Amino acid sequence: MFNEKDQLAVDTLRALSIDTIEKANSGHPGLPMGAAPMAYTLWTRHLNFNPQSKDYFNRDRFVLSAGHGSALLYSLLHVSGSLELEELKQFRQWGSKTPGHPEYRHTDGVEVTTGPLGQGFSMSVGLALAEDHLAGKFNKEGYNVVDHYTYVLASDGDLMEGISHEAASFAGHNKLSKLVVLYDSNDISLDGELNKAFSENTKARFEAYGWNYLLVKDGNDLEEIDKAITTAKSQEGPTIIEVKTTIGFGSPNKAGTNGVHGAPLGEDERKLTFENYGLDPEKRFNVSEEVYEIFQNTMLKRANEDESQWNSLLEKYAETYPELAEEFKLAISGKLPKNYKDELPRFEFGHNGASRADSGTVIQAISKTVPSFFGGSADLAGSNKSNVNDATDYSSETPEGKNVWFGVREFAMGAAVNGMAAHGGLHPYGATFFVFSDYLKPALRLSSIMGLNATFIFTHDSIAVGEDGPTHEPIEQLAGLRAIPNMNVIRPADGNETRVAWEVALESESTPTSLVLTRQNLPVLDVPEDVVEEGVRKGAYTVYGSEETPEFLLLASGSEVSLAVEAAKDLEKQGKSVRVVSMPNWNAFEQQSEEYKESVIPSSVTKRVAIEMASPLGWHKYVGTAGKVIAIDGFGASAPGDLVVEKYGFTKENILNQVMSL
């Protein structure tokens, strides 16, 4: 039963949120004021989560998908003991732990970075997917070592975003029963009344996806909210609870209007609102001891007991299933097996293979040595070569399966991979054609912001795709991905560079990786293994030519490296001194010392030609004003791939002509 103390706690959360925003003179008070009752009920009655014990693996995950309501989350984190009151007073200020939108690894208790609407909802699907897979893999009768819920607080905006449709469809199809979404349904958007833009039947929509739908008609009714969450936890499949709320509840002049969505109340309205709550407007950032005690005696007590029981269970699990327990402990540590690289393939000089196919060979080896390896493709597994051949598919019936069928849902796949990476216990990946990286670009950006160990496989990387034509031939995508800070964009030149690229991807604890791979075959370069290993990790290195300062530099990535080597050999026959540099990862190269960069691309050599079947954007930094770039300024064409490549000037003869014209 709920009582007056509970109502005091709810109103305290509202007041804290208001004061946090007023102090900053910036923020979104409407959602915290309307959604405080559902958040309070969830945290005090259901959530197994202690923000002071952030490394407890079996905790419930809470995601504020409506990240603009961050003041509510920070208020909850404060009353539950993990965020100092002073941090609320520094909301949205430089160096504070309370940024405008919640940030992963910045504030304890924040599971994923949210703000771009729809992505929190969709990353939550990834969190629930990770829980389901790990539970299927590790749980044994009487030993549910992975057993937690993912709770989401989502807004109208989240559900309008296209990604929510993709993610909800995937979650329903896979019966992710541990996913519970609380939908703050307040009928107001930033611009005004919601019905001017959004009138769909939420119940019919989600039931069509295979979700359970529950309705709480009064968002201030704590008992009904509690019952709905309890019901959701007992049902098969994911559940959405539509909670009808009033945005800015308690504000006499702004409640129920868009005026309270994204701007502070103002001092006069704050005073009237506090009086409506029965609180003293003269007291700012005020929390009574009894409110702290409620969270101490409910949420924190429950979470501590749950963690203690789990630790005891894990000890017994280790006694009964020692090998499985060791694998589980390694997985949740996020570390790789010490000798995981030993079984990775080495490709001999003379081997000819598409880097997507060589990647597929590497994937088979990784799956045997890295048990936490898990992912799939957006309906292109056969083309991406991304499936584990001897593994079962992931499904609601076989959650332990390794191959995820994401379907044609690229954006949701990207967000789900991010969610799995944030969850822990997995080294996740997703795959599609490179040209469709645009469909998940916002997820790639968020992955980089969060600093996740996530891998994205992009195949069919150039105009060499051929017959499918310009809609399927990437041009600007490479430059676009390279522009994302903290993103490893690796375009390997052969099978061995591909192997090392995968090593980088798996080992990059705080940087996501995009692997950009070919459809067409590439010859293995005649380069020693240790040189390739170091060179790919450093982003660029010499693969052919003079160790002394050369007359000419040929710079390239991916499939164009072997073409550059062919041209270099002809130049040498003409008595020219030339060096070929493979540049698979610009991001890594830029992090090297000036001494190393100078050793690879000597500043004294001004006769430089860069070769890449993509936009020239970015290459002029490396070729300088005296150099040339053989690239593509327009779109591709539909014809056999070899012919398209020739017509666009990616031939040995054109390279020689460009070099000799310098």
UniProtKB/Swiss-Prot annotation:
Site description Important for catalytic activity, residues in chain: H28, H261
Binding site for Mg(2+): D156, N186, I188
Enzyme nomenclature, EC number: 2.2.1.1
Binding site for substrate: H28, H261, R356, S383, H460, D468, R519
Record-annotated active site: E410 (proton donor)
Pathway participation: Carbohydrate biosynthesis; Calvin cycle; Carbohydrate degradation; pentose phosphate pathway
An example molecular function term from Gene Ontology annotations: metal ion binding
GO biological process: DNA recombination; pentose-phosphate shunt; reductive pentose-phosphate cycle
Keyword terms, alphabetized: Calcium, DNA recombination, Magnesium, Metal-binding, Thiamine pyrophosphate, Transferase
SUPFAM superfamilies: Thiamin diphosphate-binding fold (THDP-binding), TK C-terminal domain-like
Known partners and oligomeric status: Homodimer.
Protein's UniProt name: Transketolase
Organism (species): Staphylococcus aureus (strain MRSA252)
